A protein has these predicted regions:
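Soluble, non-transmembrane alpha-helical interaction regions
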Residues: 1-140
């Protein structure tokens, strides 16, 4: 497992312990609220994260602090890659593979996942080098 995968796994494991719940139907919503010992009209006591995912409202500050810390750790790992051939390359290679670039050829999906734009990549030699190296696998 490379550096990017280790950090991604570490962040996923921490996120998984956060206590979020999913409810995409009324029945599941009621069940979720019951599991939290809340009435179905206690809407002010929950926070909607999107994609049918909820957390308790009291956990919102801790959740966003965790997400911000994850973002900073990722940015630090990018900054510490002096050439773009380490963490940055691993990051692009992993996400290209994960998002089926070989078949879809949708770089925008990969960049959205990484919260990057083509402008950022083109203006940063390390990012450009890492992406170019990762894309070589898909050249025909």
């Amino acid at each position: 497992m490379n550096k990017y995968q280790k950090l991604k796994l570490q962040h996923q494991e921490e996120s998984d312990t956060f206590g979020w719940k999913f409810a995409n139907t009324e029945i599941r919503f009621i069940k979720m609220m019951n599991e939290w010992n809340l009435a179905s009209d206690d809407i002010d006591k929950i926070y909607y994260l999107g994609n049918a995912c909820f957390i308790l409202a009291v956990d919102k500050p801790a959740y966003f602090a965790m997400k911000e810390r994850h973002k900073k750790e990722h940015q630090q790992a990018i900054a510490q890659d002096a050439t773009g051939n380490g963490y940055i390359y691993q990051m692009f290679a992993y996400e290209l593979e994960t998002h089926s670039f070989e078949f879809l050829h949708r770089l925008d999906i990969v960049l959205d996942t990484l919260d990057l734009t083509l402008e950022q990549i083109n203006s940063n030699a390390k990012l450009k080098r890492g992406l170019t190296k990762a894309l070589k696998k898909y050249e025909s």
